Amino acid sequence: MDGEEAADIDETNSSNPHAAAVVATEMQAVAEAERPEEQQQQQMPQTSSGEADGDVDGDGVSAIAALATRVRLENMLEVVDNMFDEVSELMVDVTELMQRASELTGTTTPTPTAPENQAENAPEIEPAQPATPPEIAELLEEAIAANPLGHNVLNPGDDARSISSRHSGSDMSLDSPGSEDDSDAEAVPRWIIPENRVRSAVDMLVSQARNQDGGIATLLRRENFLQRVRSMVFSQDRVRGRESDEANLDAGNVVDEELSPELSPAPLDIDMEEGVRFDTNLPAEHSYFGPNLNRVPGVDYLEVGSTHRMLIFMHQHILFPGEVLPFMIDGSIIDEEIHDTGRDGVIFGVGFPLMQPPDDNPHKLYGVTCQIYEKGESGRQMVFYKSRALQRIVINCDDIQGPPQYIARNPTMKCYSKVKVLPEYFLPEPLKCIDMGSLNRFRDLPSMQDKFRRYQLTSTPWPLEACEEYSFEHIVEMARKKLEVHKIDTMPKCPIQLSYWLVRNLHLTEKMMRLTFLTDSVNTRLQIIGSTLKQESLFYCRYCNSSLAYCSDLFAMSKHGVQTQYCNSAGYIHETNTVYRIIAHAVGYSGEPSTEFSWFPGYQWHIIICKFCAQHVGWEFKAVDPNLAPKVFFGLAGSSVRIGKTSERTPTQGNPFVVRNLLHLVFREIE
């Protein structure tokens, strides 16, 4: 027996315990058949018989050798047949298990032995099913215990993190889908697809789905989803096998380029568009409420630190003093409030439940006071109102009387509470408080400002660091330069109003907005704003974390700035951020365009949805008049987007949690 045959038999013995006995029998038969042959060969030189006897002996040896070879081949074929029978029995068990699981869940699961029928019988897959029924969990445990090769199959209790770390030799990072380690490819049988192959295939399908209408939701609803995953795995294997070393190196360079942080595109110059510029005063008037709006007398500012009992509502967005809040509620609520207070002006409180209070007092609710300055006709049940936020307040939750209701959800009941007006502390720059007599005329000369400043520092006991701590002129100048591209020229001069105005127009993160709202010091608020001026930010989908637009593309379609509150015909209030453009292939469209109740006169609106998760993220506004500029812009809904750093953007364009759930689902079905 030669070395190759012995190696084949040894490999077979190691893979199948039943085959070891068969192969041992085979080796014994071959040894017995070869032993007479060796004896005949040893005795042939000593034989003195004739040529006829030698021929007979030679024929006998050949017959014995042929018989031994036939026995050996038959035994090897029997071993192979036994192996195929065991694999077939295993596949039948898997098929029965999947059918039983389908009966328990009420779905029709395709059998792995009939992939051609899978497109017709595939179930509608939901993207998030974290809970596994107890019956299915028991079935999976039985299958894992019965399958000696089941170390690559998911356990019922596995979560996304355990899936990601199952193979220590493979790179399972979603941030780098192009890099994978094939070290585990030979560690599992050929009929089990390695985990890193499935991950790469799913990542490719998700990337393709982003460029199609419907996004990931449509991908999951397709009947042939699992078959498409398998096909993608095999297609990638074929491509990987055909590529040469040089092609692999080039592909690696492409992946590195994709993973490199993408620079923010150059801002568009809207003034270059031909046509009549849109009047930014129109959105600020909220003319979609109609022309019959009446002025309401104003009210005085409340004393800082004083406590008042007033009508309060809840709101899903954070309002800052100076911001306009349009809303639509039952007119009887406000009319009764005017009658009860005996004042012409109306003031009420708005609380922000979504803004987390400080840890030292979790029973506090922060908000603002709002003054109604215009109202619609009172002849119908729902009345339009326009109000403006005035002062920051804090509400003790224990003092609330009545059920708190959101102002955007057509409140029908009243809710009162005691509120305390928060202070606003401002310390002017120390050097500006020093009277230099006749030298004051050099204070505002650009060529003399540095010399004048150095001269002031020599005449004061304060160090330079203390003076710069309360200096905000450089912050205002940096903010003005950054807002030049937004076409905003309504920056207030009062430091208190300026601090709130910058928060609304400099697209801060939610954490920074909370910090700026809670601080009572205007100087500290400006310092917080100044720390974010050099950061490049992106708008991300709040549901799946896909990047939608660059904050550098913000511009003002209203004289109030780039972020404004608008009310739709159903009374829901949207915080809208207007941008020139969005990232390519980031959104799709839903429904038909309409001009009804348009927030921007002369434009039609069209609902846009995230292409990755198919959730509503805003609107596209397109000019109806061809002479109106800009021709097209977008409004991103504040409740559907969040602001984050550009470094958070990943090539997968989606939340890793979504992809991990998808992988969990695929592994449970495909294995």
UniProtKB/Swiss-Prot annotation:
Residues 1-11 have a biased composition (Acidic residues). Keywords: Metal-binding, Nucleus, Ubl conjugation, Ubl conjugation pathway, Zinc. PROSITE patterns: CULT, LON_N. Zn(2+) binds at residues 541, 544, 610, 613. One of its GO terms (biological process) is positive regulation of Wnt signaling pathway. InterPro entries: CULT, Lon_prtase_N, Yippee/Mis18/Cereblon. It is found in: Nucleus. Residues 162-173 have a biased composition (Polar residues). Ubiquitinated. Pfam families: Yippee-Mis18. Pathway: Protein modification; protein ubiquitination. Residues 309-537 form the Lon N-terminal domain. Coiled coil: none annotated. Belongs to the CRBN family. Likely a component of a DCX (DDB1-CUL4-X-box) protein ligase complex. May interact with pic/DDB1. This is Protein cereblon. The lineage of its organism: Eukaryota, Metazoa, Ecdysozoa, Arthropoda, Hexapoda. The gene is ohgt.
